[in-house]
Design a protein with these regions (language model features):
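C-terminal capping/gating helix-and-loop segments adjacent to ligand/active sites or protein-protein/ligand interfaces
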Residues: 317-401
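A bilobed periplasmic-binding-protein/Venus flytrap-type ligand-binding module shared by bacterial periplasmic
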Residues: 163-170, 205-212, 286-299, 318-321, ...
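C-terminal region of N-terminal signal peptides and the immediate post-cleavage residues
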Residues: 18-34
Length: 401
């Protein structure tokens, strides 16, 4: 089903306000931040920062520190605003995030989610529970219309390319997905999770399909590929996490390029030498991950401030550069002093959703080298409709491969 069509049924469109963060917008006399649908109705940036600081906490979910540079994002946000961040199940899946919103007690509810686009199927649309709150960040107008709900119910944040991470001891070093059938890799290959639940492993199956004669319309060759390497003993069911890698439980994984810089740094700190390559036989770009505010968010102001931060294009200071003097600034001045989340993603190797706008404004920083698409390579990206079809096949076949 078409993502925009789902949203059109789910909610009426609203007119977005300007994208510039106001420094001096007055606080509203009786502001209910939990009902705020944009920065203006939240009382302006100074009022939002004050309210978020008063709450003092932010509940996030399934955010590994080395995922898209989220470790820096959380450190910077927490240091700047004095807000404690609680991260539930960092190595969980998009499915876990949705299930937690539906079933967790009030105190354990996440304030915000970061989920794969395929997780929206069955979550938004006619007859579905209203899991998310409508909120338009200041830069809402600059988000491509394809990747946002007209009413601000959800919006894309960043995306990446599927690549191969591997221990430097692996020989021969893999350069394409088809290489992973090599008997030399017996017991060494893993995915970052269950493709029926997580977006990254799901996209890894798509990449395997492209490398084996499939297409974004046909994920079956990818399933056949994993069935083959499972039967040969190359594929292991252990989850590809940093802890399992350091323990030697696997040596090769399919992963997003935006996780590679953080993974390599973490591996080095543990005395391991991790490498990364974009496969030459399949260059697959994921659709953007999706941000949304939980309609039952226990920290309404912190949730909205977090989203404003993630969609800021500021080039500003990192957590290491932020000073005690900076932290004493008023809310809006402090907000405009720190590096915006879109550039934090860039520094981790991700492609930010506001990239086109940032290039136009010259507000984008340089990302790390060596993790980008090879020059001249053809990039494939499955649409939301194609992912719905692909997910159904994976759900039906993966458990019995």
């Amino acid at each position: 089903m078409n993502l925009k069509r789902i949203v059109a049924v789910a909610a009426a469109s609203a007119v977005a306000f300007g994208a510039v963060v106001s420094i001096s917008t007055p606080s509203l006399a009786a502001t209910n931040v939990c009902k705020a649908t944009d920065l203006k109705t939240a009382g302006g940036m100074d009022a939002l920062v004050k309210a978020a600081k008063k709450e003092g906490e932010l509940n996030v979910i399934t955010l590994p520190r080395d995922w898209a540079n989220y470790g820096e994002a959380m450190d910077l946000f927490s240091k700047a605003f004095g807000i404690k961040i609680n991260d539930d199940n960092p190595d969980g899946s998009s499915a876990y995030e949705i299930q937690t919103i539906k079933t967790a007690p009030a105190a354990k509810q996440p304030d915000v989610v970061d989920i794969g686009v395929s997780a929206l199927n069955g979550v938004i649309g006619a007859g579905q529970d209203k899991l998310f709150a409508n909120y338009k960040v200041a830069n809402f107008n600059a988000i491509p219309s394809k990747w946002k709900a007209d009413n601000g119910n959800w919006y894309g944040d960043y995306n990446g390319i599927i690549g191969i991470s591997y221990d430097a001891s692996v020989s021969p070093a893999p350069t394409k997905i088809a290489d992973l059938t090599n008997p030399a890799y017996k017991g060494q290959i893993a995915l970052t999770g269950d493709p029926t639940a997580g977006q990254e492993p799901f996209m890894s199956v798509y990449a395997a399909s492209l490398a084996n004669g499939g297409s974004v319309d046909n994920i079956q060759p990818g399933l056949d590929f994993f069935k083959k390497i499972k039967a040969s003993g190359n594929f292991t069911s252990v989850k590809a996490t940093g802890e399992n890698y350091v323990a030697g439980a696997y040596k090769i994984a399919l992963t997003w390029n935006f996780n590679a810089p953080g993974n390599i740094a973490s591996a080095k700190a543990a005395g391991k030498n991790l490498k990364f390559v974009i496969p030459t036989d399949a260059v697959l770009a994921g659709t953007p991950y999706i941000q949304a505010i939980n309609a039952k968010a226990p920290h309404c102001a912190a949730a909205r401030l977090w989203e404003e931060f993630l969609y800021s294009e500021n080039k500003g200071k990192t957590s290491a550069q932020l000073t005690a003097k900076d932290i004493k600034l008023t809310g809006s001045k402090l907000f405009n002093t720190i590096m915006g989340g879109q550039n934090v993603f860039v520094s981790g190797g991700a492609a930010p959703i506001l990239q086109a706008d940032m290039i136009k404004k010259n507000s984008i920083i340089d990302g790390p080298e060596g993790f980008n698409v090879p020059k001249g390579a053809k990039v494939y990206q499955p649409s939301p409709d194609q992912q719905v079809t692909g997910k159904a096949l994976v759900a039906a076949q993966w458990p019995t491969l």
